């Protein structure tokens, strides 16, 4: 966990031996991403050369370091400079992204345990006045002990800093209701988390899930009955809604009963 007063390391871009790194086959608009061959560290080299944008990232990074007291976010601990700030280094988390959770686990009880841990971690992040904003299953890393870690943290909104990043799940949802938010707030994060949950469970967007299909799935996964009211609320035409965290709807202590 990061404490107040902890300073980030800093290295020169020219000191990085890229022959010892492997470039990840990951389509990112923001960065070229590498991992060392021992899979200990993630290197991100920003694609932008806009000095104002880079300066903004550096301010946000400093705030994230100070905020991450509960350790639920993977915040870079080293900055890379090449005359100016141009990248970061952070620890690599062995495991899988949440979008691969059904490949790793077939047992719905195990899957639900992971989802509930991720939901509780999201609440912890919100309590530190951070909004994930680009919340999606590729940005939640599940380690080998089934604990969740929120990654790609420079896309988050910290306190009152402006942030233009919006999750594709939330963007689709807001567009369907003709909503143009001024900023992404934690209540939207909670909606996005449930959108993500239903998306992974049904392998389609919420807008494509029919009520009859949902009710049929309830026979297979019992906890969906508890989520039916939230599902209806999300699918409703109401613009301003507030949904609970997943772990507030489903008792984490009863994860063997899903």
Residue ranges and their predicted role:
Residues 110-124:
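Conserved alphaE helix
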Residues 19-79, 101-102:
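ATP-binding glycine-rich loop module of kinase domains
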Residues 71-114:
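Conserved structural core of kinase catalytic domains
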Residues 138-173:
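Activation segment/activation loop of eukaryotic-type protein kinase catalytic domains
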Residues 176-187:
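Conserved end of the kinase activation segment
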Residues 122-143:
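Catalytic-loop of the protein kinase fold
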Residues 4, 19-25, 29, 33, ...:
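Helical subdomain adjoining the active site within ATP-dependent kinase catalytic cores
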């Amino acid at each position: 966990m990061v404490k107040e007063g902890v300073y980030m390391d800093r290295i020169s871009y020219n000191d990085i031996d890229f022959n010892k790194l492997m470039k990840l086959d990951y389509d990112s608009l923001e960065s070229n991403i590498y991992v060392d061959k021992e899979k200990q560290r993630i290197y991100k080299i920003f694609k932008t050369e806009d000095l104002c944008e880079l300066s903004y990232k550096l301010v946000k990074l400093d705030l994230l370091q100070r905020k991450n007291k509960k350790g639920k976010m993977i915040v870079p601990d080293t900055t890379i400079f090449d005359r100016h700030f141009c990248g970061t280094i952070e620890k690599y988390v062995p495991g899988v992204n949440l979008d691969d959770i059904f490949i790793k686990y077939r047992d719905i009880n195990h899957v639900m345990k992971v989802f509930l841990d991720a939901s509780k971690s999201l609440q912890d992040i919100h309590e530190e006045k951070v909004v994930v904003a680009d919340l999606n299953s590729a940005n939640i890393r599940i380690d080998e002990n089934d604990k969740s870690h929120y990654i790609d943290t420079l896309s988050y909104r910290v306190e009152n800093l402006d942030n233009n990043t919006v999750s594709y799940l939330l963007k689709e949802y807001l567009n369907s209701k003709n909503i143009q938010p001024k900023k992404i707030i934690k209540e939207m994060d909670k909606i996005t988390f449930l959108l993500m949950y239903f998306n992974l469970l049904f392998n389609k967007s919420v807008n494509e899930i029919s009520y009859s299909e949902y009710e049929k799935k309830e026979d297979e996964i019992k906890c969906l009955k508890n989520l039916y009211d939230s599902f209806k609320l999300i699918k409703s035409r109401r613009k301003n809604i507030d949904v609970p965290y997943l772990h507030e709807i489903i008792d984490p202590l009863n994860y063997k009963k899903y």
